[in-house]
């Protein structure tokens, strides 16, 4: 058996052996609310979970990213970043509803991206347990602010801090039956529409900001 085949076999065995822990982590994390820009509770949970699996040097940065540098030194370049985001699109700040039905888990944001965030942590745990020796350092990242008004806050902070040191970037998101290889970016604008306004009856005929906003949205789509 080649070295590659041997590692592959160890990975498969590890994943099967630790599947119950992986599922338990999903059940727990899925209940923790994490609207964009308010991922504090999940960040703390993820840091503690990684540390419980043997990770050292785990940090929560100013953007609420949870970062575990694996075999990364101050002089490490050519880094590989593996990310799963912690925020969900739902604004809830109370514990999220969760249920299991016919072998399936149901919870707000569980597929985007709670399950994958746990998968990233399990990858890190596997690297530690199997004492994997990568050719380059790896950043395991639970990033914040991926959804909506989060505006990629966590990723922007990561690139600000590590910049050109990162040569490979993998975002684990959505379903796992496809790979997107083209760069994906986003731009956001904050638009203010100012009109005369006034009372809908007494000032009838004045320009209405809502009308123009709706017209702009219709044009975009």
How should each PLM-predicted stretch be described?
Residues 2-106, 129:
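Acidic/His- and Gly-rich active-site-bordering loop/insert found
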Residues 102-111, 198-200:
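A short glycine/serine-rich beta->alpha loop
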Residues 13, 179, 198-204:
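A short glycine-threonine-serine/GTX helix/turn-capping micro-motif
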Residues 87-100, 166, 181-192:
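Acidic-glycine-rich active-site phosphate/pyrophosphate-binding loop
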Residues 109, 113-188:
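Acidic/histidine-rich catalytic neighborhood of metal-dependent amide-processing enzymes
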Residues 201-221:
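Acidic-enriched catalytic cores of C-N bond-cleaving enzymes acting on peptides and small amides
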Residues 28, 121-129, 215-221:
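Short glycine/serine- and small hydrophobic-enriched flexible loop segments
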């Amino acid at each position: 058996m080649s070295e590659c085949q041997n590692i592959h076999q160890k990975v498969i065995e590890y994943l099967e052996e630790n599947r119950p822990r992986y599922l338990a982590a999903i059940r727990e994390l899925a209940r923790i609310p994490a609207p964009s820009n308010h991922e504090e509770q999940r960040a703390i949970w993820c840091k503690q979970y990684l540390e419980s699996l043997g990770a050292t040097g785990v940090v929560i940065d100013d953007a609420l990213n949870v970062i575990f540098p694996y075999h990364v030194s101050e002089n490490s370049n050519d880094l590989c970043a593996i990310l799963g985001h912690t925020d969900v699109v739902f604004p809830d700040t109370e514990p999220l509803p969760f249920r299991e039905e016919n072998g399936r888990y149901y919870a707000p944001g569980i597929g985007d991206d709670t399950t994958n965030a746990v998968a990233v942590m399990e990858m890190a745990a596997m690297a530690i347990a199997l004492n994997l020796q990568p050719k380059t350092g790896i950043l395991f990242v639970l990033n914040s602010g991926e959804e909506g008004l989060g505006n990629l806050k966590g990723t922007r902070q990561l690139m600000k801090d590590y910049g050109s040191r990162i040569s490979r970037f993998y975002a684990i998101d959505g379903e796992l039956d496809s790979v997107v290889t083209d760069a994906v970016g986003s731009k956001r604008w904050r638009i203010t529409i100012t009109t005369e306004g006034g009372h809908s009856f007494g000032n009838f005929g004045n320009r209405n900001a809502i009308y123009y906003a709706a017209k702009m949205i219709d044009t975009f789509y």
